[in-house]
Amino acid sequence: MDIVQQVGLLVVLIIELVIVIVIWVKVYKLCKEDRRQKKIDRLIARIRERAEDSGNESDGDTEELQDLITEGDNLMHIGIRDNRNN
């Protein structure tokens, strides 16, 4: 192999590496959002269940849900968007 082929091969490998990194970052963000949404769904279900059982909502669960929603709003302000709305 001459030097031109080696440089070309190196450029191709670097481009592939960048593509792989971009894909994995996107997958990580989607998984993180999915886990957050599942946690919110569980909290909502627990609040509803407790409201049906006792006639009122649990303040702790409601506060935790509010914290998660606020965290989601903060993430949207820094550029991470909810893909389900797109």
Curated annotation (Swiss-Prot):
UniProt KW Zinc keyword: no
Supply the InterPro entries for this chain: Vpu (IPR008187), Vpu_cyt_dom_sf (IPR009032)
- Say if the entry is tagged with keyword Cell membrane: no
Give the UniProt subcellular location, in the record's own words: Host membrane
Q: Which domain of life is it from?
A: Viruses
Subunit architecture = Homopentamer. Interacts with host CD4 and BRTC; these interactions induce proteasomal degradation of CD4. Interacts with host BST2; this interaction leads to the degradation of host BST2. Interacts with host FBXW11. Interacts with host AP1M1; this interaction plays a role in the mistrafficking and subsequent degradation of host BST2. Interacts with host RANBP2; this interaction allows Vpu to down-regulate host BLM sumoylation. Forms pentamers or hexamers. Interacts with host CD4 and BRTC; these interactions induce proteasomal degradation of CD4.
Main localisation: host cell
Provide the protein name. Answer: Protein Vpu
Q: Where are the transmembrane segments?
A: 9-29
Question: Could you list which ranges are Cytoplasmic topological domains?
Answer: 30-86
Question: Which post-translational modifications are recorded for this protein?
Answer: Phosphorylated by host CK2. This phosphorylation is necessary for interaction with human BTRC and degradation of CD4.
Gene Ontology cellular component terms for the protein in this record: host cell membrane; membrane
Alphabetic keyword roster: AIDS, Apoptosis, Host membrane, Host-virus interaction, Inhibition of host innate immune response by virus, Inhibition of host tetherin by virus, Ion channel, Ion transport, Membrane, Phosphoprotein, Transmembrane, Transmembrane helix, Transport, Viral immunoevasion
Q: What does the function comment of this entry state?
A: Enhances virion budding by targeting host CD4 and Tetherin/BST2 to proteasome degradation. Degradation of CD4 prevents any unwanted premature interactions between viral Env and its host receptor CD4 in the endoplasmic reticulum. Degradation of antiretroviral protein Tetherin/BST2 is important for virion budding, as BST2 tethers new viral particles to the host cell membrane. Mechanistically, Vpu bridges either CD4 or BST2 to BTRC, a substrate recognition subunit of the Skp1/Cullin/F-box protein E3 ubiquitin ligase, induces their ubiquitination and subsequent proteasomal degradation.
Which chain positions lie within coiled-coil regions? none
Phosphoserine occurs at S54, S58
Q: Which GO terms describe its biological process?
A: receptor catabolic process; symbiont-mediated suppression of host innate immune response; symbiont-mediated suppression of host type I interferon-mediated signaling pathway; symbiont-mediated-mediated suppression of host tetherin activity; viral release from host cell
